[in-house]
Amino acid sequence: MSIVTKSIVNADAEARYLSPGELDRIKSFVMSGQRRLRIAQILTDNRERIVKQAGQQLFQKRPDIVSPGGNAYGEEMTATCLRDLDYYLRLITYSVVAGDVIPIEEIGLVGVREMYNSLGTPLSGVAEGIRSMKSVVSGLLAGDDAAEASFYFDYAIGAMQ
């Protein structure tokens, strides 16, 4: 739920107008909209590069993943791993636009630990893949933009640990 929706729901539940503090938070959210959209556009435009380079970093750091017996061994399983990275990048992009972790939380994390555990996929590997995407993205963004995106990458990484 966005800051706008939360503020309205809270105010309405108390049958009151929005408070000055709520209006300030909404103003800040609206004012940061162009920046969030710019970040999302950069992530979207560079998604293939981000996923490919992050995959390369992941497989260098964790060769066990692509070795015989590893969860990303073989072309099909490597493609599945990269597909999962792309999925998390998409959710992070949604969260940047929303200015909230809810897209990551509600779309991407519900039941994910159980699913990966049932498949024998190490969560540490998934976290490392997301960390690798964060590293690639940090080279595409600067300053406040990088910090904004990093927050959502860190949230997803933390959920996998």
From Swiss-Prot:
Modified residues (N4-methylasparagine): N71
GO biological process, one term: photosynthesis
Keyword field: Antenna complex, Bile pigment, Chloroplast, Chromophore, Electron transport, Membrane, Methylation, Photosynthesis, Phycobilisome, Plastid, Thylakoid, Transport
Subunit structure, as described in the record: Heterodimer of an alpha and a beta chain.
Biological role: Light-harvesting photosynthetic bile pigment-protein from the phycobiliprotein complex. Allophycocyanin has a maximum absorption at approximately 650 nanometers.
Annotated family: Belongs to the phycobiliprotein family.
Protein name from the UniProt record: Allophycocyanin alpha chain
